[in-house]
Amino acid sequence: MSKPRKQHGVVVGVDGSLESDAAACWGATDAAMRNIPLTVVHVVNADVATWPPMPYPETWGVWQEDEGRQIVANAVKLAKEAVGADRKLSVKSELVFSTPVPTMVEISNEAEMVVLGSSGRGALARGLLGSVSSSLVRRAGCPVAVIHSDDAVIPDPQHAPVLVGIDGSPVSELATAVAFDEASRRGVELIAVHAWSDVEVVELPGLDFSAVQQEAELSLAERLAGWQERYPDVPVSRVVVCDRPARKLVQKSASAQLVVVGSHGRGGLTGMLLGSVSNAVLHAARVPVIVARQS
């Protein structure tokens, strides 16, 4: 029995930045591939704190609403253009007056995926992950895709593979599920990466490298076997290396169209924390990154 669809489909949070424009386009394409609705959301943050406190003019709220409507309208236009007239896509939009992070977390509980730009208009530098994106990848009730406006230029991007990091944790099993689904919908290869050392080999005296490598390769093959039976249309390549996971994933992402990681790995303490590998990949990869989460 297939699981029931969530009411919001793919949700894109927009704020008028270049990154959110890119997110609207990517989210629309993903929603069209899934044949589910796209919901464009802009949250007007009426609770703006200053020090010392200062009064805002009465027209402030009107200006915020007008700007919000323009942001939503532009994002909807970009989303429809990204999909094209020959593909069917149901697009809804919401303008919400509230606090951005709690609102988006609540919406995520009824979404198949949330898509956000890597940094918003308030970002100090494009190398930083925006505060809303950073919070959502820690707290959302569904997978979160983070999109850059300056994605790396990849030859023939539509045929580039999907990349997934696997470390044997339950969360990486969820990432594997998301990655197979995305690769199947795109009709591309899946590259499964297992980098099994968080330290340099020279720091591990007496290590039987060949034995560990062989065991790691066997473990990855076993992890993937069931998924390959479920998705026989997805060609799979396995990469098993003695390397730091984040470094290898970022390196391999240069030739991928999408990277999928778990929200935290074997060392993750709780669902509220973002693992060091996921955090590093989100900041360093220049292609879309999905952080696999669930409610």
Curated annotation (Swiss-Prot):
Coiled coil: none annotated. GO terms for cellular component: peptidoglycan-based cell wall; plasma membrane. ATP 2 binds at G165, D198, G262, S263, H264, G265, R266, G267, G268, S276, V277, S278. Disruption phenotype: No visible phenotype under normal or hypoxic and normoxic stationary phase growth, nor in mouse- or human-derived macrophage cell lines. GO terms for molecular function: ATP binding. It comes from the Bacteria. Keywords: Antibiotic resistance, ATP-binding, Nucleotide-binding. Induction: A member of the dormancy regulon. Induced in response to reduced oxygen tension (hypoxia) (at protein level), low levels of nitric oxide (NO) and carbon monoxide (CO). It is hoped that this regulon will give insight into the latent, or dormant phase of infection. ATP 1 binds at G13, G117, S118, S119, G120, R121, G122, A123, S131, V132. Pfam families: Usp. GO terms for biological process: response to antibiotic; response to hypoxia. Probably involved in aminoglycosides resistance and virulence. Overexpression increases resistance to the aminoglycosides amikacin (AK) and kanamycin (KM). Belongs to the universal stress protein A family. This is Universal stress protein Rv2005c. It comes from Mycobacterium tuberculosis (strain ATCC 25618 / H37Rv). The lineage of its organism: Bacteria, Bacillati, Actinomycetota, Actinomycetes, Mycobacteriales.
